[in-house]
Amino acid sequence: MIRVMTDNAANLPPELREQYGIRELCLTYTVNGVPADMSAPFDGYAYYEAMRKGAEVKTSMISPLTAREAMEPVLEQGDDVLYIGLSGGVSGTCWGVSVVAQELRERYPHRDIRVLDSRGASLGEGLVVLEAAHLAQQGADMDTIIARASELCGKMRQLFVVDDLKFLRKGGRLSGAAALAGTLLQIKPILEGDPEGKIVVHSKERGRKKAMEQLIRLYQELVEDKSRPVGISHAAAPAEALHLATELRQAGCTGEILSVCHEPVTGAHVGPGMLALYFYSASWR
C-alpha cells in the first residue's frame, strides 16, 4: 500500500485528508514569539487580523524528527511512502524531508520512499496531493502516481492578488521604495508561482477590483479544461472568495471549486487580504 503524505501548507481541509487517507506533517509558526498550537483548528480571522495590527510572524520548516516519526511507523507496517511537499522555491522543507527519506531508505531497503516537490503552495500543492491520493486508493503503483503528479505540477497555475505590499517587502520580494510607491498608487500586483516554484510578479493592476477581474481573464485565457477542479484561497477575505467563485462559474467553470482560508505558513509572507486562484493549464513548466 502507498501512503500519501503532505504538509499543512497544502491547505487541505481535515475531512478531505481523512477521506483520502492523507497524513499531514506540520510546518510551525510563532506569533509575537508565541508558538502556535498546531493541534488546534486554525483561526484564520484571528491570525490575519493580528498580522494586520502588526504582529510578528515567523515560520519554521518541518523538523527531521517530525518527518521521521511520521514515516517510520508506516514503513514498519510494510507500506510505501510518497511525500508531496511545499515548493522548494519558497521553503527548504522538501529538501529536509528528502534527507530523512534517504536515511530511511537505508534502514528499510525493501520499501519505496519518494519525495516530490510540488513547486506549489496552498491548493496549488493540495489539488495535486488529492489526485495522487485518489490514485493510491485505486491501487495505482508508485511510478504511475509520480508520473501523474509530476504532470499536474507542470500544469498548475497559481495566481495571487495581495492587499498590502508591505508583507512582500518584509519578505524581500519588493524594495521598500517600490512597496511605498505601490501603496500610494493603489497598485495591486498579481503574483504567480514560476517554473521553479518561486513567487514572481505576473502583472500589476490599478486597484483591487481590476486585479480580481484580471484573475478571471487569466483563467479564461490559460485554463486547459473547465471541468477540472479549481482552488481558491483567501487570507480572511471570504466575501471576495465567494465573488471569485461566482465569477468563475459565469466564466464557464464546471469543475469542483474548493475554497479555503489560506494556511498560515505561506500566508505569513503574503499577508491579510490575499486572494489566490489555482487551476490547471496546458503543460508549461
Q: Model-predicted segments: where are they?
A:
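Short loop/turn motifs at secondary-structure junctions
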Residues: M1, Q77-D80, C253
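N-terminal glycine-rich anion-binding loop in soluble enzyme alpha/beta folds
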Residues: R3-T66
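Glycine-rich phosphate- or other oxyanion-binding loops that anchor nucleotides, phosphorylated ligands
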Residues: R52-V99, M142, I146
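A glycine-rich beta-strand to alpha-helix segment
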Residues: G85, R114-V115
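Mixed-charge interfacial surface used for oligomerization/domain docking
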Residues: R3, A9-R23, T28-T30, V90-T93, ...
